[in-house]
Design a protein with these regions (language model features):
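Accessory N-terminal region flanking or inserted into the helicase ATPase core
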Residues: 1-17, 24, 130-246, 257
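Helicase P-loop NTPase motor core
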Residues: 2-7, 11-33, 301-303, 308-326
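Post-Walker A helix-loop "phosphate-sensing" segment adjacent to the P-loop in P-loop NTPases
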Residues: 31-41
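Short, conserved loop/helix-junction motifs that constitute active-site signature segments
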Residues: 36, 239-241, 263-268
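Conserved P-loop NTPase-based nucleic-acid remodeling module centered on helicase motor cores
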Residues: 40-159, 294
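Hydrophobic "anchor" residues on beta-strands that sit immediately upstream
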Residues: 69, 244-247, 272
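Conserved Walker B
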Residues: 246-253, 277-278
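Conserved RecA-like helicase ATPase core segment
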Residues: 258-326
Length: 326
């Protein structure tokens, strides 16, 4: 069995494709569940289907476990922790918005601005929309059939902002970085500046519309989950937190996911981060693998371990399962 004493408070394990990374992570999970109990160790992977396959392998190995999903996803870990915190505090429990509910909120926000135009009472966001569309009669661009295209862009914008952790307090910094190259501002970067200036107030209006639509509930987008969970980490009691989190395919974590892991690390949760930057497949959704691996070492003080290829050799059922997803 793996010796957990060989791990630091944060350990970053890097291995080539098919070198046995997932099997290494599973071995660590089995050892941690033996030491800490089934509730205090968890493994996060990049997708639900992989989680189910690996979770079944763990359950077969241990015969019985106290948590239904010993292998899950990082958002599920965040949701579980936030639910525990809010339940103890007597607050409404988190519930994710589905796609239809999100569409209703987005269209409500856009309809408010078309209403401003119709009444001749344009607001600051209306002015930004006019600049964004570069036409005087911009309201037609977010109404009727045209609304579908812009609503889709709006939805994607919300997700990308949340995934990179673009908080309101970073607005001025992000706009400045997007707009300038040295002391010059070209047309492309000016366009980026306009987009960022519009994105922040629209997201603020969207968040307020969610609160107005569900005044007695705590509703949030799936992409917003990691941000809110990070804020809740400081409120968590020790029993709400695992002793060890193992993250397989760490290269596919979002920046918001990294912030969540950093907050847990600051609370004393041990981290085992396993992956390979060259195997990233989620860069289009806010994953920056090279940055993640550098930041794990510089910000968390993670010790780098390079996995030897011979670790993949294993005749066990667990090893066979891991080899298919490593």
């Amino acid at each position: 069995m793996m010796d957990l004493d060989d791990l630091d408070d944060a350990t970053l394990v890097v291995g080539a494709p098919c070198s046995g990374k997932t099997r290494y992570a599973l071995d660590a999970l089995i050892a941690a569940m033996h030491r800490y109990g089934g509730e205090r160790a968890v493994m996060a992977v990049s997708g639900r289907q992989v989680a189910d396959v690996l979770g079944d392998a763990v359950i077969r190995e241990l015969s019985a476990v106290s948590q239904a999903r010993p292998v899950t996803t990082l958002p599920a870990v965040a949701f579980r922790m936030m639910t525990a915190v809010r339940s103890r505090e007597g607050k409404p429990l988190p519930k994710l918005l589905n796609g239809a509910e999100q569409d209703v909120i987005i269209r409500r926000v856009l309809a408010a601005h078309t209403g401003h135009v119709e009444r001749g009472d344009e607001c600051d966001t209306c002015a930004l929309l006019r600049t964004y569309f570069a036409v005087a009669d911009w309201s037609g661009m977010i109404a009727d059939d045209s609304a579908d295209a812009f609503a889709g862009q709006f939805r994607d914008m919300l997700a990308r902002m949340n995934e990179i952790g673009a908080k309101p307090e970073f607005e001025d910094e992000l706009i400045a970085r997007a707009a300038s190259r040295g002391e010059t501002v070209d047309a492309h970067r000016e366009r980026l500046r306009v987009q960022w200036r519009l994105a922040f107030p629209l997201r603020g209006e969207y968040d307020q519309a969610v609160r107005d639509a569900y005044p007695d509930q705590f509703r949030l987008d799936a992409s917003r989950l990691m941000i809110d969970a990070t804020a809740a980490v400081d409120e968590a009691e020790e029993k709400d937190l695992p002793k060890l989190i193992i993250v397989d395919d760490f290269q596919d974590a979002t920046l918001a996911g990294f912030d969540f892991l950093s907050a847990l690390h600051n609370r004393g949760v041990r981290l085992l981060l396993v992956g390979n930057p060259d195997e990233a497949v989620q860069t289009f959704r806010g994953s920056y693998p090279e940055y993640l691996f550098n930041a794990a070492q510089s910000r968390m003080g993670a010790r780098l371990v390079r996995l030897e290829p011979d670790h993949a050799a294993d005749g066990t059922d667990r090893g066979a399962v891991a080899s298919r997803v490593s």
